[in-house]
């Protein structure tokens, strides 16, 4: 599988603009095949999403790498992830030296992923079962926030929990089938938004989502 990871980095990520050395190293290290269903492990390093059950998916490797790069995170930063899912994105961020707080709303996925992350000894990851659109207020502020599900707007609680300066990366769109990948920068109390292309994520469900 190590060769598959190396091939993924070399053929799928680097030619498409992933240049952050920490991101590339993490993507080449995290065992993605352990985060997918056993029957789908042969496809783990192919560049497309895969189902993980309960109507949820693990994002394709390029999107995971792209969003991680857009965070512009430095080791030791605190990152809030909304939508734990398979746990793969959280593992990549932890491998980059970040302290990850991740929230999942589906109990079955939360329990399975929490146990997997513990088994793999990702001690920098804290998991929580809750409405992700509410964030993790008692542990705020966060240097970086990443959302791995698409909602109609940027959740206000997440903006409030983003440090200043800080960066948030999330999919936003009025359509439940397609969104724009948005980068929000908070600086001196102001928000600066930029769009980074079309994406398609599962729904962000909660008080400040669908």
From Swiss-Prot:
EC number: 2.1.1.77
Signal sequence annotation: none
Record: active site: 59
Subcellular location: Cytoplasm
Matching CDD domains: AdoMet_MTases
Record-level GO cellular component terms: cytoplasm
InterPro entries, per the entry: PCMT, SAM-dependent_MTases_sf
GO biological process terms held by the UniProt record: methylation; protein modification process; protein repair
EC class of the enzyme, as a word: transferase
Catalytic activity, as annotated: [protein]-L-isoaspartate + S-adenosyl-L-methionine = [protein]-L-isoaspartate alpha-methyl ester + S-adenosyl-L-homocysteine
GO molecular function, one term: protein-L-isoaspartate (D-aspartate) O-methyltransferase activity
Pfam families: PCMT
Sorted UniProt keywords: Cytoplasm, Methyltransferase, S-adenosyl-L-methionine, Transferase
Family, similarity comment: Belongs to the methyltransferase superfamily. L-isoaspartyl/D-aspartyl protein methyltransferase family.
Protein function: Catalyzes the methyl esterification of L-isoaspartyl residues in peptides and proteins that result from spontaneous decomposition of normal L-aspartyl and L-asparaginyl residues. It plays a role in the repair and/or degradation of damaged proteins.
Protein name per Swiss-Prot or TrEMBL: Protein-L-isoaspartate O-methyltransferase
